Structures are given as C-alpha cells and as structure tokens.
C-alpha cells in the first residue's frame, strides 16, 4: 500500500489517512459519546460521559495539542510486515478456546462504533403515515365538537347581562327606575339577537371546517395505494362517514335545544324585569346615597391623612439634613486628626533618627576612650622609662593633649544634642496637649450627635403611633365596605336575575371605592417604606458615630503609645547624660593623671639638672714650644 501525501499542518486530519492513534481516539472519546447519545435517544437518564482530556489514563498522546504523525508508504509496508510476522508467531502457539458470552459481548462492543439500529422499511413508513393521518383526523373532530359544546354551555350560562357598553352606562345615568328597566329590556333583546346570529355563524363555520377536513382526509386516503391496503382505506372512509353523520346529528340537536332555551330565557327576563323594576329602583337610589356619603367621608379622611403625612415627611427630611450636616462635620474632624497623627509620626521618626545618630556618636566616643585607655597605659610605661627617653615622653604628651581636645569637642557636641532633644521633647508635649484638646472637643460633638439621634428616634416612635391610628381607620373603612357588600348580597338574593346588571353597576362602584382604598393602602405602604428608609439612614448615622468613637479611641491609644515612647526616649536621654558624665569624669581623671605625669617629668628634669650640676667636666688646653698641644680633662664633684 503506497501513499503519497504532502506535508500538512499538525492539526489537519484527513479522513483517508491512517494514523497510529485512531483506536485510542475511538475507544476513549467517540465510543462513550455514541453510547451517551443512544441512551438519550431511548429516553434513559444517563450521566454525561467523562472524556479524559488530561493525562489521567495514560492518554497524554491523544491530546489535540500534540502533532499527529503521518505514515509514508515505506513505514506502512514495514508495519504490515511486522504485523504479519507477529501474527504468524501467535498462530504457531494458538489454541482454540471457547469464549464466554461476556467476553464475546465485550469484543463486539469494542469492535463496532454504531450499534442498536432499529429496522426501517417502506411498509413500516407507510403504516406510520396512515396511523398519523387517522390520529390527526380524530383530533380535529374532537376539537370541533368540544368547541361547539363549550359555546353552547357559554350561551346557556351567560345571559349577556354583564356586558354593558360604556355608552349604555352613560345613557342610564341620572334616569329613573322605570326608564332604567325599559333600557335594560331593550338592551337584553338586542344582546339575545346578536348572540343568536353569532351562534348560527359559528356553527356554520365549524360545519364547513369539519366537512373540509373530512373531504381533505378522504382525498388523501383515496390516493393510489398498493392493492393489499385498499380494503383498509375503504374501511377508514366508512368510519369517517359515520363520524360526520353523528356530528351533524349532535349539532342539530344542540342547536334546537339552544333555540328553545333562548326563547324561555327571553320570556323569563321580560317577566322578571316587569316585576322587580320598582324594588330595584328604590334600592338603587338608597345605595347611591350611601355610596355618595361614603365617598365624601373617604375623601375628607384621605385629604387629612395626606396633609399629616406630608408634614411628617418634611419634618423627617429636615432632621435628616441636620444629621447629614453633623456627620460631615465629624468626618472633617476625623480627617484633621488623622493629618495631625501623620505629622506626629513623622516628627517621632525624626527624633528616632537623631537618637540613633547620638548613639552612633556615643559608640565612637567609647571607642576613642578605649583607645585613650591603651594610650594611657603606654604613657605610664613611657613614664617609667622617662629618665631614659625624655623626647618620647614629650611627643606622647603632645598626642595626649590633642586627643583631650577632641574629647572636649565631642563632649560639647553631646551637650548641644542634649539641648536639642530637650527642645524637641517640649514641642512634642505641646502637640500632645493640642491633640488632647481636640479629642475633648470631638467628644463633646459626639455627645451632641447622640442627643440629636435620641430626638430623631422619639420622632420615629411618634410616626409609628400615627401609623397605628391610620391602620385603625383603615379597619373601620373595611368594616363599612363589608357591610355594604352584605347589603348588596341581600339585594341580589331578593332581586330577580334581570336586576343583575344594575347590581353589577353598584358592585363596580364599590370596586372603584375598593381600588381607591387599595391606592390609599399603597400610599400608606409607601410612606411606611419612606419611614423605614429614614430609620435606616438614622441607623447608618448611629453606626458612623460609633465608628467615629472607635476611631477616637484608636487615636487615644496611639497618643498613649506615643507618650510611652517619649518617656522611653527621656529615660534613654537621662542614661546617655549619665554616660556622658562618666566620660567627662574619666577625661578629667586622665587629665589629672597627665598633670601628675607632667609633674613627674618636671621633677625628673630637675633631678637631671642637679646631677649634671654635680658631675661637671672641665677641658683645658696647653701649648708647648715645638707646636705640641696637650688636652687635660678634669672632673669635679661638688658636694654640699
């Protein structure tokens, strides 16, 4: 098998190319997905397949990021030869064994990619199509019959008494009871006539639609079929004819019943309107008077409640403005205090740096003192040998004098640093006093804010009491509405079916009143929401005040810590002063020792002079004739 393929990108996988990893892709990716799709098609509840995109089963080589290696013709020939040789080796040692059903089933599942295909033939498709047509026809007939029956029941139950137009309502207003009864009778007759016409038109349309559907079904079923299915098609046509006859019979009987019921209903309505027109007119006038009184009461109550709520809302808004202003002032104070704290921290860092510099200078002075100690020991050794090396003693004296000058300058610098630190400590103490004053002022402001918050809470309690009063008024109005509804129910029991429209008018009026009540309830709920929002803002102000108090406490703690650090620095300064005093005492002691050494040197010089004065040598020269010079040295010891 020779394949001549061009070099293509690594992700391109043509369908006609042989790859090494096709079996791995099939068994680990495609086969679980195909099994999942088959189970979903059967309606089973199956978990989604786990596709191993990570290297959890040794499938790292099947990642899409890896390049796919293609085979050329020589590699395919080599692989086929190795496979044939391996097959020959296996056949030599092969023994036929009986497989278990489980292993056979697993082998079959592994060898196929698509499985469980249902049979699909022409006969089955034609049967399904015929069955589908028959079901559609039966559903259409059922829907038509149900619509006709529902329409008949609606006509029987609904007398069209509640369907008054707006123009008719306007024409009735302000008329007497007899005129209203006459108008209702004429309107009912018109409604009955229009209902009859609509019913006849609807029944005619349904009959035409059903006949068309039947003819369409027959034309479909009369299409040329195979010889073995024609008898079945004729049987279906006979069943369709029977169904159409039954439906026609049902429709005609239902129409006859509807006409008879409509005529009896018309007679009853005329009699009822004639008998009960007087009673209904009197009751209508009484109910109108009551409704007008209730409307006036409700309007007055609503206006009064609106005014009260508006006044309360304005008061709450003013209190909120005051609380917001106080909150802004507190925030400004907190910002100022935070800036002062940052300045204090910077000043503290400067003081700490200066102390570190003084400590470094102190360490240098200690090192110098150690050097001076060593030099003093050397001076003592030189003083012991002063009689032998006076010159060396003088040089060491000069060096000691220069070093003493350096120590005196260092001492002067330490004294100046001490004065500077004392000045800085006084500045820090003054800053601390200013911060404490500002803290007292902020505490006073916080107490004022707490008093104002208590006042706001008292106002909120008063608003809640007013809301309770409004709820009692609402309950009394609901009781009145219930009494009116009970009265209306009594009128409905005593009145005739023809007076339902008049009562419905009153019910509409009561519904309007109820709607107005609901609007008032909604407005009341909105006011309650506004009050809750105000309470939330008050709580937020309280929380902010608590946070401000916490911040003040933190500032106080920071100031306490700074004072403690300042005390520590004072102690360190006092210790440094003690050390500097010790160094000055040592320097003075060294000066005394040097003075004693100088005195010893002076005494040594004086003793040397005395010794020289005691032991003097005299040199005399004499000349002899003949140019000879004689030198005579004589020593004299002067004894006292």
Curated annotation (Swiss-Prot):
- Give yes or no: UniProt keyword Repressor: no
Record-linked SUPFAM superfamilies: Myosin rod fragments (SSF90257)
User: Where in this chain does the entry annotate a coiled-coil region?
Assistant: 123-619
Q: Which UniProt keywords apply?
A: Coiled coil, Cytoplasm, Motor protein, Muscle protein, Myosin, Phosphoprotein, Thick filament
- UniProt entry tagged with the keyword Zinc-finger: no
**Function, as annotated:** Paramyosin is a major structural component of many thick filaments isolated from invertebrate muscles.
Similarity remark: Belongs to the paramyosin family.
- Name of the molecule in the record: Paramyosin, short form
Q: What is the lineage of its organism?
A: Eukaryota, Metazoa, Ecdysozoa, Arthropoda, Hexapoda
Report the gene name.
Prm
């Amino acid at each position: 098998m020779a394949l001549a393929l061009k070099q293509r990108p690594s992700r391109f996988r043509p369908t006609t190319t042989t790859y090494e990893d096709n079996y791995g892709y099939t068994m680990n990716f495609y086969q679980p997905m195909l099994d999942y799709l088959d189970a979903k098609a059967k309606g089973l509840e199956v978990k989604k397949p786990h596709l191993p995109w990570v290297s959890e089963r040794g499938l790292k080589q099947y990642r899409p990021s890896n390049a796919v290696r293609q085979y050329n013709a020589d590699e395919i020939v080599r692989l086929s030869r190795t496979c044939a040789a391996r097959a020959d080796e296996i056949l030599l040692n092969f023994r036929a064994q009986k497989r278990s059903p489980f292993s056979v089933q697993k082998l079959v599942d592994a060898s196929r990619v698509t499985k469980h295909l249902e049979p699909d033939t022409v006969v089955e498709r034609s049967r399904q199509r015929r069955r589908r047509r028959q079901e559609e026809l039966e559903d259409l007939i059922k829907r038509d019959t149900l619509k006709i029956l529902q329409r008949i029941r609606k006509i029987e139950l609904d007398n069209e008494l509640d369907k008054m137009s707006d123009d008719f309502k306007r024409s009735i207003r302000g008329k007497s009871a007899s005129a209203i009864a006459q108008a209702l009778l004429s309107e009912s007759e018109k409604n009955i006539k229009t209902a009859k016409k609509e019913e006849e038109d609807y029944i005619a349309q349904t009959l035409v639609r059903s006949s068309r559907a039947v003819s369409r079904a027959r034309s479909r079923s009369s299409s040329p079929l195979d010889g073995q299915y024609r008898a079945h098609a004729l049987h279906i046509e006979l069943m369709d004819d029977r169904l159409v006859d039954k439906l026609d019979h049902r429709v005609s009987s239902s129409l006859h019943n509807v006409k008879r019921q409509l005529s009896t209903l018309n007679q009853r309505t005329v009699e009822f309107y004639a008998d009960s027109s007087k009673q209904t007119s009197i009751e209508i006038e009484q109910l109108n008077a009551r409704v007008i009184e209730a409307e006036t009461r409700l309007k007055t109550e609503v206006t009064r409640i609106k005014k009260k709520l508006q006044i309360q809302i304005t008061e709450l808004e003013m209190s909120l403005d005051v609380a917001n202003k106080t909150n802004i002032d507190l925030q400004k104070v907190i910002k100022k205090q935070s800036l002062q704290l940052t300045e204090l921290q910077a000043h503290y860092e400067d003081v700490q740096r200066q102390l570190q510099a003084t400590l470094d200078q102190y360490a240098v002075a200690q090192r110098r003192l150690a050097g001076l100690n060593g030099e003093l020991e050397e001076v003592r050794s030189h003083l012991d040998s002063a009689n032998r090396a006076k010159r060396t003693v003088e040089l060491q004296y000069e060096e000691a004098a220069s070093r003493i000058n350096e120590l005196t300058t260092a001492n002067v610098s330490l004294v100046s640093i001490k004065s500077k630190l004392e000045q800085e400590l006084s500045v820090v103490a003054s800053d601390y006093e200013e911060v404490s004053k500002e803290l007292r002022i902020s505490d006073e402001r916080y107490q004022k804010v707490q008093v104002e918050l208590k006042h706001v809470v008292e106002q909120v309690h008063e608003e809640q009491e007013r809301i309770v009063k409004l709820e009692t008024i609402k309950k009394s109005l609901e009781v009145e509405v219930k009494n009116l509804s009970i009265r209306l129910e009594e009128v409905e029991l005593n009145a005739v079916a023809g007076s339902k429209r008049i009562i419905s008018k009153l019910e509409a009026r009561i519904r309007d009143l109820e709607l107005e009540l609901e609007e008032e309830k909604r407005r009341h709920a909105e006011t309650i929401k506004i009050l809750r929002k105000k309470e939330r803002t008050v709580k937020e102000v309280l929380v902010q005040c608590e946070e401000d108090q916490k911040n003040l406490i933190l500032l106080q703690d920071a100031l306490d810590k700074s004072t403690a650090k300042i005390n520590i620095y004072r102690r360190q300064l006092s210790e440094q002063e003690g050390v500097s005093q010790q160094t000055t005492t040592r320097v003075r002691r060294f000066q005394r020792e040097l003075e004693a050494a100088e005195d010893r040197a002076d005494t040594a010089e004086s003793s040397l002079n005395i010794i020289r004065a005691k032991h003097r040598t005299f040199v005399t020269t004499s000349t002899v004739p003949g140019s000879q010079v004689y030198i005579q040295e004589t020593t004299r010891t002067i004894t006292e």
